[in-house]
């Protein structure tokens, strides 16, 4: 149930420190990235690792010390995301996990879910390199850096910290590099979508469209995962704004959902289709402007 609450106040610095940095920035100035997918096999080790890693996580804090000060952009970043199995492995109780959306709890590899989103045939989960029943993941470390050398040092440190606490292993490593000409493989300019979020900036889309615990464009608070008050004795989490859930905490506040999809792109096939369609439509319009107006 959605609850109508009106507030467009800018985020406090405390809230910004509680929001992960990748939610509010694509870190476009950092061209090198690594995605390190993890498995947890010891709960206490996983919790200790997360406590020790927490101070290193890049938050959404302002890049300006003062309003009139220049930006101090980070030269490297670290963010984390967890799957439902990862949260369970960290000790999150089942009744809290049940308050998450079914799409998250079931995951993309679930038979009905994969069918709904078109992951069938050659794209079926059974053929995935990871993220399926054969090679599940509990979490991912997202690293960005200003140089390949810096990224490699950060990757080694991340892996070493896992070993030091006796925690699981890195299942798979994926790497990405932003092209110097800012063009993706199809030849189009790759401007990572990054809408302005109201509360982070003075104008933009309401925060609830991207961040849990806030008002969305419809003027409501979307449903957020819940945690019983008895599991938050220190009162670290705010109360749920939903009157039907009095006595429960808003576990999702300042969090969001992340989707990682690995796709194979057929560049030659795409442009072959474009040429064929251009010939078919040649008598109707200028094919170059009709199909390629956004290609740079």
Name the predicted role of every residue range.
Residues 1-296:
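Long, low-complexity, Ser/Thr/Gly/Pro-rich intrinsically disordered segments that act as flexible linkers
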């Amino acid at each position: 149930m959605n609850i109508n609450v009106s507030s467009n106040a800018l985020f406090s610095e405390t809230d910004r420190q509680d929001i992960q940095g990748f939610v509010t920035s694509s870190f476009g100035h950092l061209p090198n990235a690594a995605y390190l997918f993890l498995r947890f096999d010891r709960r206490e080790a996983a919790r200790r690792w997360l406590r020790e890693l927490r101070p290193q996580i890049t938050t959404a804090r302002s890049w300006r010390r003062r309003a009139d000060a220049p930006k101090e952009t980070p030269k490297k970043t670290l963010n984390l995301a967890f799957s439902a199995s990862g949260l369970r492995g960290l000790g999150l109780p089942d009744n809290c996990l049940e308050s998450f959306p079914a799409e998250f709890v079931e995951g993309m590899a679930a038979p009905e879910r994969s069918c709904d989103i078109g992951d069938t045939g050659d794209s079926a989960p059974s053929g995935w390199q990871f993220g399926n029943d054969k090679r599940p993941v509990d979490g991912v470390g997202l690293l960005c850096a200003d140089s390949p050398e810096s990224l490699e040092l950060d990757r080694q440190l991340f892996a070493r910290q896992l070993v030091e606490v006796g925690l699981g292993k890195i299942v798979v490593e994926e790497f990405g590099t932003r092209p110097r000409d800012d063009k993706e493989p199809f030849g189009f300019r790759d401007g990572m979508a990054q809408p302005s979020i109201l509360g982070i900036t003075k104008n933009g889309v309401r925060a609830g469209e991207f961040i849990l615990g806030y008002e969305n464009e419809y003027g409501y608070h979307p449903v957020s995962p819940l945690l019983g008050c008895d599991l938050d004795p220190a009162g670290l989490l705010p109360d749920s704004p939903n009157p039907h859930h009095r006595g429960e905490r808003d576990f999702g506040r300042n969090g969001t959902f992340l989707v990682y999809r690995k796709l194979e792109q057929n560049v030659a096939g795409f442009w072959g289709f474009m040429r064929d369609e251009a010939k078919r439509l040649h008598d109707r319009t200028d094919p170059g402007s009709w199909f390629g107006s956004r290609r740079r």
